[in-house]
């Protein structure tokens, strides 16, 4: 017995001595994953963000789902109600160079989500502190001709009220073997609609129906999605004013290709009182080396004589961003070229112009009378923004962004403008964000423009 143990020990020593230096180095490499399973570290994991009210299954909660009930169609529903929303309150001043507005303004968005199943739900939303024209509740300090006054704007009309689901999940008995490819998404009611990153369409409340074919597998890509759109009410034209006689017809497409994601849209807007229009857009999203890029081309065509609601033109737009080495920060350069008088098909009253994605100096804040430092219409002009966004803290709960923006008319008009601005954001707790904005702008043949704001955003 002792002889056998001695032979085994000598064999083990021989095996270790014959191990290659590379194998030994690999075992001692600190970057090598351990063979021992590590426990899940949940001590520093944030608590579940409970909504304002939840009945039924918990939002992002652990445990089993309700048993539910079966519909005659075969669908199994287990309804749950989640009530959530956000509150925005800001003190802000905006000086255009000719007039100054200083105000305290508030907005409240409340939503009730009835989750019927994983793919079916009904969402109802209200904005009780603003009216249907996008005017908010608050207190006005300037201009003087308005006097110091409070303004109470409210509306109990639902800003959101729609149902969405999937045909195959609503009627599973039609295709028990899952061979008919009933992957058709359905959305009906008052809902937001954004196309081409908000350049072609940007409206937070439009009455529409859409039917979407998901999970198509073309030979030249991994995923193709096609949607048909029809809208009949709450349609604001490109000048942000509602056209009560307008109807919108559209096709929206999305495809994942080996090196790019491509979005394409084709729209026709018919009106009984204003000019009809054709609209088209195509965009490509990809990485070129270490640079994330987006390129978009959008076109508007007035069928008859153009007016403020629809004009003919082309908008070229590009975004580029990267993370500088050894940081988690973002350096970005965005630019546009507006050829003739491009007009968006649909723009909500708070959406501003089509160039909001160019940068902070072009974006509308969507709250009160605080405008964009630089014009975001983009007609017959070219411009862009250079910005640097920094993140601070282990959890990146603090951000600071500096941006330089500018534009110049391309038709010989006066109107060159340059703006420099900054935004600071700080997370407070798990539901609140403090936002500070400031800018200064120089415009050709005009006085300086400046503005600043402090906003508190609470999500619940």
Annotate the PLM regions.
Residues 10-101, 111, 115-119:
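N-terminal periplasmic/intermembrane-space "pro-region" immediately following the signal or transit peptide
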Residues 38-42, 99-232, 452-453:
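Outer-membrane beta-barrel channel domains
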Residues 67-83, 113-122, 167-184, 216-225, ...:
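Short loop/turn motifs that connect adjacent beta-strands in outer-membrane beta-barrel proteins
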Residues 70-73, 109-111, 162-164, 210-212, ...:
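Outer-membrane beta-barrel architecture
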Residues 166, 183-185, 191-355:
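Signature for the C-terminal beta-barrel architecture of outer-membrane proteins
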Residues 260-305, 345-429, 435:
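Outer membrane beta-barrel transmembrane domains
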Residues 447-460:
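Outer-membrane beta-barrel "beta-signal"
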């Amino acid at each position: 017995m002792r002889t056998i143990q001695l032979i085994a020990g000598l064999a083990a020593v021989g095996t270790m001595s014959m191990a290659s230096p590379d194998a030994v180095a690999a075992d001692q490499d600190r970057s090598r994953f351990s063979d021992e399973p590590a426990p899940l570290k949940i001590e520093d994991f944030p608590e579940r963000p409970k909504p304002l009210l939840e009945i039924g299954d918990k939002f992002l909660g652990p445990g089993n789902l309700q048993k539910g009930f079966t519909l005659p169609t075969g669908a199994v529903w287990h309804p749950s109600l989640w009530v959530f929303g956000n509150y925005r309150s800001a003190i802000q001043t905006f000086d255009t160079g000719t007039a100054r507005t200083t105000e305290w303004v508030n907005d409240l968005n409340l939503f009730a989500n009835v989750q019927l199943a994983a793919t079916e739900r009904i969402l109802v939303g209200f904005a009780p502190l603003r009216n249907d024209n996008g005017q908010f509740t608050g207190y006005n300090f300037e201009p003087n001709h308005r006097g110091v006054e409070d303004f109470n704007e409210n509306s109990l009309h639902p800003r959101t009220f729609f149902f969405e689901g999937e045909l195959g999940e609503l009627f599973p008995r039609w295709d028990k073997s899952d061979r008919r490819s009933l992957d058709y998404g359905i959305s009906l009611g008052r809902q937001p609609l954004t196309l081409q990153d908000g350049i072609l369409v940007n409206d937070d409340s439009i009455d529409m129906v859409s039917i979407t074919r998901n999970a198509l597998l073309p030979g030249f890509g991994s995923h193709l999605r096609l949607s048909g759109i029809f809208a009949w009410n709450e349609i604001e034209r490109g000048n942000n004013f509602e056209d009560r006689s307008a109807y919108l017809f559209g096709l929206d497409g999305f495809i994942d290709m080996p090196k790019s994601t491509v979005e394409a849209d084709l729209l026709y807007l018919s009106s009984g009182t204003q000019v009809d229009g054709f609209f088209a857009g195509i965009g490509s999203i990809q990485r070129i080396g270490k640079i994330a890029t987006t390129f978009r081309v959008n076109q508007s065509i007035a069928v008859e004589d153009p007016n403020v609601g629809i004009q003919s033109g082309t908008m070229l737009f590009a975004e580029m961003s990267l993370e500088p080495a050894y940081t988690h920060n973002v350096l970005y350069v965005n630019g546009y070229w507006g050829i003739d008088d491009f007009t968006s098909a649909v723009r909500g009253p708070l959406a501003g112009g089509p160039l909001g994605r160019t940068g902070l100096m072009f974006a509308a804040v969507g709250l009160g009378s605080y405008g964009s430092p630089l014009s975001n219409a983009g007609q017959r002009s070219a411009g862009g923004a250079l910005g640097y966004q920094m993140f601070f803290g282990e959890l990146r709960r603090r951000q600071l962004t500096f941006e330089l923006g500018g534009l110049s008319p391309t038709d010989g008009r006066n109107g060159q403008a340059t703006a420099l601005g900054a935004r600071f954001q700080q997370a407070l707790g798990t539901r609140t964000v403090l936002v500070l904005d400031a800018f200064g702008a120089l415009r050709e043949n005009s006085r300086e423009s400046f503005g600043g704001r402090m906003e508190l955003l609470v999500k619940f």
